[in-house]
Amino acid sequence: MNPFDIRIGQGYDVHALVPGRKLILGGVDIPHDRGLLGHSDADALLHAVTDALFGAAALGDIGRHFPDTDPNFAGADSRVLLREAVRRVREAGYEIGNVDATVIAQKPKLAPHISGMVANLAEDLGLPVTRCNVKAKTNEKLGFEGKEEGIVAQAAVLIYRRNGDAQD
């Protein structure tokens, strides 16, 4: 087996919290007095996972595929973007092994919404929920996350080449 038949990708996204926007994380609408500012629905969790997938397959990043300068993506549903990223990764000859993600937010408490985020990720990635994980952390009131100015998401994915597909 070629050692590059298995690849990892790392993704990161950050958005500011602002009044007048819905807070959507992992495709889940979360009750809060503010939401994330962005060109699309600003789902930082799904953006981090999407970026990790593109990176693992050496396909660039989310901005290359879904630029924030393109009006077609204004207000876009990040679940749709993630499913398209999955299609492109599979088209490149890879399957997804698992995803592990962390959302860093002082407020709101995300624990009640984690199972919904995991279910959405599993559905969009075509994986069982046992291969999708989301963790929520505060920043212990430190930095912009701790001051409730924004939310960060980080993700790691593992992908592997399908048998019989071209090698590096």
From Swiss-Prot:
One Gene Ontology term of the biological-process aspect is: terpenoid biosynthetic process
Q: In which pathway does it act?
A: Isoprenoid biosynthesis; isopentenyl diphosphate biosynthesis via DXP pathway; isopentenyl diphosphate from 1-deoxy-D-xylulose 5-phosphate: step 4/6
Per its record, the protein catalyses:
4-CDP-2-C-methyl-D-erythritol 2-phosphate = 2-C-methyl-D-erythritol 2,4-cyclic diphosphate + CMP
One Pfam family it belongs to: YgbB
The keyword Lyase belongs to this UniProt entry's keyword annotation: yes
Residue numbers for the site described as Transition state stabilizer?
A: 39, 138
Q: Which UniProt keywords apply?
A: Isoprene biosynthesis, Lyase, Metal-binding
Matching entries from InterPro entries are given as: MECDP_synthase, MECDP_synthase_CS, MECDP_synthase_sf
EC class of this enzyme? lyase
Signal peptide stretch: none
Please list the residues that bind a divalent metal cation: 13, 15, 47
Q: Which residues cross the membrane?
A: none
Q: What is a GO molecular function of this protein?
A: metal ion binding
Q: Where does 4-CDP-2-C-methyl-D-erythritol 2-phosphate bind?
A: 13-15, 39-40, 61-63, 66-70, 144, 147
Q: Which cofactor does it need?
A: a divalent metal cation
Cofactor: binding comment: Binds 1 divalent metal cation per subunit.
Its assembly, as annotated, is:
Homotrimer.
Describe its function.
Involved in the biosynthesis of isopentenyl diphosphate (IPP) and dimethylallyl diphosphate (DMAPP), two major building blocks of isoprenoid compounds. Catalyzes the conversion of 4-diphosphocytidyl-2-C-methyl-D-erythritol 2-phosphate (CDP-ME2P) to 2-C-methyl-D-erythritol 2,4-cyclodiphosphate (ME-CPP) with a corresponding release of cytidine 5-monophosphate (CMP).
PANTHER family, alphabetically?
A: 2-C-METHYL-D-ERYTHRITOL 2,4-CYCLODIPHOSPHATE SYNTHASE, CHLOROPLASTIC
- What is the official name of this protein in its record? 2-C-methyl-D-erythritol 2,4-cyclodiphosphate synthase
What species was this sequence derived from? Cupriavidus metallidurans (strain ATCC 43123 / DSM 2839 / NBRC 102507 / CH34)
